[in-house]
Design a protein with these regions (language model features):
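Extracytoplasmic
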Residues: 1-145
Length: 145
């Protein structure tokens, strides 16, 4: 699921900051579709929900592709209210795609579900709390027990 397509389809909910679709061609390759969803103007405590359609009740492995840059912050995640396995540090000396980042495996019911990103801080060398979201993938991982 392209994050920028979710924004274009009004499938996001934001509490803190704004989002825009950002072309990434000027930063080299590696972004799916050549764009990302750029989240700016947020601070610690801001939340961005990506609303996704889950086709069937099942366990799903959830993977997200993000961006790193000198002015990006740290994110934590929830999938349908369940905490993700790790936080993501977006700070980097150069703008670059993160590659796949595993949020964990989650039991999800069919229908609209939220993948939530929360700004939780930043490195001392980062100049901001920005975030870039490229895409999200859900892989079936077994029946709900």
């Amino acid at each position: 699921l392209e994050a920028e397509a979710l924004a274009k389809a009004a499938r996001i909910v934001i509490a803190g900051g704004q989002v825009q679709v950002q072309p990434m061609g000027g930063f080299g390759g590696g972004w799916s579709g050549g764009e990302q969803l750029f989240w700016h103007g947020g601070a610690v405590g801001a939340v961005l929900d990506l609303v996704v359609d889950v086709p069937a009740a099942s366990k799903y492995a959830v993977e997200i592709y993000l961006t790193r840059a000198p002015d990006y912050g740290k994110l934590s995640f929830e999938v349908d209210g369940q905490p993700g396995a790790m936080t993501f540090n977006g700070s980097s000396p150069a703008v670059a795609p993160s590659g796949p980042f595993q949020l964990g495996t989650f039991a999800l019911q069919a229908g609209q579900r939220k993948v939530s990103l929360m700004i939780v801080g930043k490195d001392a060398d980062s100049t901001g709390y920005f975030a870039g979201i490229d895409k999200l993938r859900l892989y079936p991982a077994g029946a709900i027990e």
